[in-house]
Amino acid sequence: VSDRYAVVGNPVGHSKSPLIHAAFARQTGQDIAYDRLLAPLDAFAVTAQRFFHEGGHGLNVTVPFKREAWDLVDECEGGALSAEAVNTIKRVGNQLIGYNTDGKGLLADLERNLGATITGKRVLLMGAGGASYGVLQPLLERKPDLLIVANRTLDKAERLVRHFHKDASGVPQGVAARPYDNLGGQPFDLVVNATSAGLEGAMPPLPENLFAPGAIAYDMVYGLETRFLAFARANGVRCTDGLGMLVEQAAESFFIWRGLRPDTAPVIAQLRSDH
């Protein structure tokens, strides 16, 4: 019998995770079954526990359950601790271990696939929701010259910044929260959209001179030409969606579960050509 894995979310029908993990399994000769698991909005824990009780080996967790997954697991590793969000669960004996592979996925896509450098650069992170919690710490570990978190409601951005800078002085080094209408006058080398604004279409008020020469505009949403990417393209900026991040965070999950690192490039290329 194949080892069972699944992605759990609501909605989950659109998820590309089963395709990605099937490709990884073929590539590495692993015998796994990977399904979609729709959890009722009020029954994530029950759904996940049943899956593991019935012999499931691991889960990927997507919107809107990453925070609940953090509450569910018995212990957290690495990025999941700081993010207070879990997107990968591994069953070890009767313990559930939680991980967050979003930050590693973003960095792998930016650095390996896109050849971007973050160290010493000026970075803008748009949004202060769960997606930002998952990637802020890994971005900061690359030591950018400046990292600004922008959000419609400033106090949410300030809360995010404080969450990751609980040092004695209480003064974050090189990271600050700003409202969108206070971003002018300093172009950024990397702008990451971690809001769902890409989906709804409404875009925050961004200044014309947002992008430095050679900048990269990165939208975590994939498969859609978002308003943000259209804005960046109109400014002549190099643009990319979140498909690479999706595949890279999946590869990190696969490594956690199976101990093997799949080759992501052919899988990204396959998904791009399918779209």
Over which residues does each language-model region extend?
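Short glycine-/small-residue-rich Rossmann-like dinucleotide-binding loops
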Residues: 63-64, 193-198, 221-222
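Glycine-rich adenosine-cofactor-binding loop
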Residues: 9, 98-103, 110, 114, ...
